[in-house]
From Swiss-Prot:
Binding-site residues for Mg(2+), renumbered to this chain: 17, 55, 116
Protein name as catalogued: ATP-dependent dethiobiotin synthetase BioD 1
TM annotation in the entry: none
Catalytic reaction annotation: (7R,8S)-7,8-diammoniononanoate + CO2 + ATP = (4R,5S)-dethiobiotin + ADP + phosphate + 3 H(+)
Record family assignment: Belongs to the dethiobiotin synthetase family.
EC number(s) on file: 6.3.3.3
Pfam families: AAA_26
Gene, per the UniProt record: bioD1
Cited SUPFAM superfamilies: P-loop containing nucleoside triphosphate hydrolases
Positions with a binding annotation for ATP: 13-18, 55, 116-119, 176-177, 205-207
Residue numbers annotated as active site: 38
Compartment list: Cytoplasm
Lineage summary: Bacteria, Pseudomonadati, Pseudomonadota, Gammaproteobacteria, Enterobacterales
Enzyme class: ligase
Signal peptide residues on this chain, from the entry's feature table: none
Amino acid sequence: MTKRYFVTGTDTEVGKTVASCALLQAATQLGYQTVGYKPVASGSEMTTDGLRNSDALALQRNSSLPQPYSAINPYTFAEPTSPHIVSADEGRAIDAAVLSRGLRTLEAQADWVLTEGAGGWFTPLSATLTFADWVQTEQLPVILVVGVKLGCINHAMLTALAVEQAGLPLVGWIANDIQPPGARHGEYLATLRRVIPAPLLGEIPWLGVSPSQAATGQYLDLSPLERA
């Protein structure tokens, strides 16, 4: 049976992709056939191969099961803004059925599929649909990425509560050091451990400006997911 997870974050720019790559690496090391899925991405660049998103490319690189880019990232937008805004501007609506079909295709091939969201938990995909709505429909277990910085405790508690209210299991969380640790870093982590109702899968240290290129799977322990 395919293991499937959804990665969300406490905010945008908290390192969801860094954590997702680490998860894919760690699952591959456990012997799984892994694939990462970034169904909606904005902030993409035109290349000789067409419009490409750096986060989706990172997931593609870190998947053990080779996939064409279109399978990893069905909706790609150039402007780095909320998906519902840019999709409306371009007249290209985001269809939840397309997201689900893409997920089914990957699930039929891999036994460990990781879907990465965009922005935070309630990121709008249209005037009537949020990413949270789609995740709830798919009944995906959730992994929360916390970018460790001032304000992250409140954001983590709010997101964990929203996941719980959606009736979805929060199966783990990852502390991602998105800046050099400050004087209160240890206290932030201790508080997060206490208030997030899920096991800590690991802490990814501050790695500088290109963390998605690093071997980050070593920082995670997926045994709580194996037991779930």
